[in-house]
Amino acid sequence: MQVICDPGGFPLWVSDVRPGSTHDLTAARELVLPALYPYAARGLPVLADKGYTGAGIGVHVPVKHYPYGPLHTDNRCYNFLITALRAPAERGHALLGRWRALDRVTVSPHRIGAIVAAALVLTSLDRGSR
């Protein structure tokens, strides 16, 4: 499942669920990135984790650490900043995950997508009531 969050960490959109063997980047290329590229082309950054390395221009991911030595100080600072900026998006995942209907879901993947979409609606309604 792919989630798009606003800069404050509130979930705005959730994708349909893909089989567990589908890599994050493959699902993102199919479901999310085509919608985000126009914004990235206008300079709006898209932040992602290391699973999205190679996603394309405008998608910022941390620099991977390789076994041949420590990361350069610049790369470590870059990783720290990207991770800190991504923290609100992780909050968005937590907001969706708080609904008990999503605990230990064992139904078909097609139904999981509908349950997650309902959780997004409930999260939006809950936000409006505060």
Label for each model-derived stretch:
Residues 1-130:
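Short, well-ordered secondary-structure "scaffold" segments embedded in the functional core
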